[in-house]
Amino acid sequence: MKKIILIVSILASTLVASAQNTSLSYIEKFKDNAIRIMHETGVPASIVLAAAMHESACGNSNIAQKLNNQFGVKGGGKNFYYKNNKKVSTQYKKYDSVMDSFQDFADIMTSRKQFCHLTDELTHYDYVGWAKGIQHSGYCSSHKWAAQVLNIIHKYQLNLYDESPADPTQLAANPQ
């Protein structure tokens, strides 16, 4: 019995470590793009990253892998992808690249009537206000969405990216 408990514990810790590595590699891969989008649109980099991580399971969901859709955005007509050699029809939007998906999320936040008030009311430092505002404006049906996104931000300290300068060379020029 002790051996079984030990094996289960080892497997569980391996899975947690694997998920952590997936999250960290996703952040590393897309943080600079999220920072650029923040400086162009005012949507916090932490919100862009955490929402993408949450909605796409760090890029591992079917729609993230097959459609480059990191945010679960619907629209764009009928799209298709293949799963187990079968054609699957979907209402989710297809993007040419992950970056196009990130950019579209920021465009949705800044141009759609239900969300654009957030850029007027909040700074890119107020990630808590953004998460709650996005949820209250109808982005998702889950009443836990903001809390889940905020948990990701806190767990990985994504709010530190909201402090990043527009020009990455400024980081080296202004050491702290």
Task: Tell me the role of every PLM-derived stretch.
Residues 4-14:
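Sec-dependent N-terminal signal peptides
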Residues 16-176:
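Catalytic cores of secreted/periplasmic lytic hydrolases that degrade extracellular macromolecules
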